[in-house]
Amino acid sequence: MSLKPTNALTMINNLPDVPSQVDICITEQDLGPATKFLPAVEEYAQEDVAVIFCDSDKIYDPNWAARLINAAQKNPDCAIAEEGSDLRHISIYNWSGTSVPRAERIKKDLKYRLRRALSLGRWKPRKNVASGYVDILEGWGGVLIYPRFFTKQAFDIPDCAWMVDDIWLSGQLEVNGIKIWLTKDEDIRTKGGQNELETPLRKQK
């Protein structure tokens, strides 16, 4: 994590207890949201190790990391993500990569809307229904990368991209010729929200 001087002491004094196998690293440079993976990329730049990152405000199922690792073994030269989009789905630009097969998105047709309505909104499927390539990875679903996928340019983040690490990371992968493979081996949706309830409990343990 990266801490600014004004709140560094407070944060350090309130770090949670973690297992002995876990290290909490505090970096000198604040790279925005990308701080959760770029320092690891730099530290292990000369090693052939996988770096897995995610968001801290989500709940991940026990098999989440194993799925990313399994997908990486089948696609060793790709970044692996469980959530992602093509550029045309999230921007005004009608462009997408040419690598096939593309990840297939769920069709929000009448059948989809009826099922959502009948479940009173509780049925929330993943937006992708089949594995394939995407233009933009989405870190909240979990991502596996290798340090060799990046150059020093990844650390020179412009102001306009400082808060959009998914876009910046995906762009760096594209520049370096690395494809993004979205894996959809299991129909498990990453959950959020519960963390707000669990955080106070963790602090009391």
Language model segments and positions:
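Active-site-proximal specificity loops/subdomain of glycosyltransferases
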Residues: 2-49
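Short aromatic-enriched loop/helix-cap "lid" or pocket-rim segments at secondary-structure transitions
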Residues: 8-12, 91-95, 195
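C-terminal catalytic/acceptor-binding lobe
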Residues: 156-205
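Short coil/turn segments at beta-strand junctions that form active-site/ligand-binding loops
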Residues: 47-49, 76, 178
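Conserved catalytic core of nucleotide-sugar-dependent glycosyltransferases
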Residues: 59-157
